Curated annotation (Swiss-Prot):
The gene is rpsZ. It comes from the Bacteria. The keyword Transmembrane does not apply. Signal peptide: none annotated. This is Small ribosomal subunit protein uS14. Its cofactor is Zn(2+). Keywords: Metal-binding, Ribonucleoprotein, Ribosomal protein, RNA-binding, rRNA-binding, Zinc. The lineage of its organism: Bacteria, Pseudomonadati, Aquificota, Aquificia, Aquificales. The keyword Cytoplasm does not apply.
Length: 62
């Protein structure tokens, strides 16, 4: 729980320059591998997609 509280606190902080702002996953707080279109990291995206929580997203097969 402390990690989520820290992420929430960091999101309230406005950096001195806009370029310093880092996109973070609102679910787990991960700063890397962020997918802007879905506003979550790749790991959370995969979990939600496999569960069927994201409409129109399906596993690719060819």
């Amino acid at each position: 729980m402390p990690r989520k509280a820290k992420v929430a606190k960091d999101l309230m902080y406005y950096p001195k320059w806009k370029s310093r702002k880092k996109n973070r996953c609102p679910i787990c707080g991960r700063p890397r591998a962020f997918i802007r279109y879905f506003n979550m990291c790749r790991i959370c995206f995969r979990e939600h997609a496999l569960r069927g929580d994201l409409p129109g997203v399906r596993k690719a097969s060819w």
